[in-house]
Amino acid sequence: LDEKKVPKEFFISKGTLDKWIYLKGPKRADRVTKTGHKYKYSEGPVTFPDALDRASRTIVTGEGGSGASRFKHVVETKSGKLRRLTPVELERLNMFPDNHTKEATDTKRAFFMGNALVVGVVQKLSKSLLKQL
């Protein structure tokens, strides 16, 4: 979407940027279970911001809301600002028509897209399966 058409609440504030960077970054920590078992927790980095010249990561149900998250998609605008994806962009990634979920709140719309299947892929699979019947 054109940056000018994106509501301001989708932009990441400088005050929360450090949290986003931490959550998207690699982590390694010693942990202990309730039963006393010690283990190493680790997770690799997530591309931040998301690359626009590659396939998108999976949309998850926690995509909505303004809070920082390891799993939410973040893109860099032409002017260098960082922002979350809008509901329409999430719909487009899943090949739904624009505003397919417009009756719901933005958070619920993102949740719906996190639970959705990519429509075009399902259509192609079904056509292929029907030919084999």
Positions of PLM-derived features:
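C-terminal target-recognition/interaction regions appended to catalytic cores
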Residues: L1-L133
